[in-house]
Amino acid sequence: MTEDLTTPLSSALSPDVKIYVAGHRGLVGSAIVRQLEAEGCRNLLVRTHKELDLIDQSQVRSFFERERPEIVVLAAAKVGGILANSMYPAEFIYENLMIQSNIINWSQKTGIKRLLFLGSSCIYPKLSPQPMKEEYLLSGPLEPTNDAYAVAKIAGIKMCESYNKQYNTSYLSVMPTNLYGPGDNFDLEKSHVLPALIRKFHEAKESGDHEVVVWGTGSPRREFLHVDDMAAACVYLLGLPAASYKDLVVKLKPCLINIGMGRDITIKELAELVKEIVGFKGQIIFDTDKPDGTPQKLLDISRMDTLGWKAKISLRAGIADTYGWYLKSVQKL
């Protein structure tokens, strides 16, 4: 790789460069828009689902031919928890494949300089060695509860690689660890563990309960990254010099980069931390009759380390920030 990989290029993200962020209302997409605006980018393209149905090829074609963005961030996806993935696998694989295919294909056909595709750590095998390296992709069976979604995301990675090979494009995939932050989903039936814990402890505190029940033994280890750090990493990559960015696309096998903290925490430690930040004074009860899930999920972030980027927001500060946002959102209800 070239020596200047750690030097962001301001001209790559000049104020007037036209950047299309697909999925700007989601947790990650909204954070990327905030980060780009903070960097001084003032020519951002966003569209709601009502304005642009990304599953409709004709609409996507018309949009790209009319607007002709220079950079595309593909953060749009159909997402959901274990229940939704198990009940509607056909929708998850179809809608994600269509969104990715339409955007990647028409990006190439309209001469897009750079595209950043956001995947998910669920692309890695269920029993992957820890920490999970990018090279472990397709080295074993997937987690069956969300394999339709994972296969769609893997197809997106392979589509970017194929277009790079055939059309000499510069389409790069990034795989985030578990994300959290302002704008997260706090629905207890659909949310992930961290926002669910925030809500549980808050509601227990407000109602004067003496205990909060947490599923499992508390021993599984998980990695968490604040969504603003994820956005900063994406913008950092998009701002790399043209030669450095192209070097990544050409040399990385597979052509993807993990983005995470590089360290994990047990669910028990996480629960204790959330309890402290929320101010709940009762006990934590671990329901050991409930499943634990995978013992550990930690990303290897060596590739991002080599590029000179590291996450800045500590888990404690990030949870406090997220809880503050949650309190404001609750007050609006």
Regions found by a protein language model. Name each.
Residues 57-97, 109, 126:
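NAD(P)H-binding glycine-rich loop region in Rossmannoid oxidoreductase-like domains
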Residues 7, 27, 31-39, 203-333:
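C-terminal substrate-binding subdomain of Rossmann-fold SDR/epimerase-dehydratase oxidoreductases
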Residues 119-120, 157-185, 195-197, 206-213, ...:
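Conserved beta-loop-beta element that borders a ligand/cofactor-binding pocket
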Residues 37-62:
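Adenosine-cofactor binding site in Rossmann-like domains, unifying the SAM/SAH pocket
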Residues 24:
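NAD(P)H cofactor-binding loop motif with strongest signal on the N-terminal glycine-rich segment
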Residues 148, 152-155:
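Active-site helix of classical SDR
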Residues 101-146, 172:
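Conserved Rossmann-fold NAD(P)-dependent oxidoreductase catalytic core, especially the SDR/UDP-sugar
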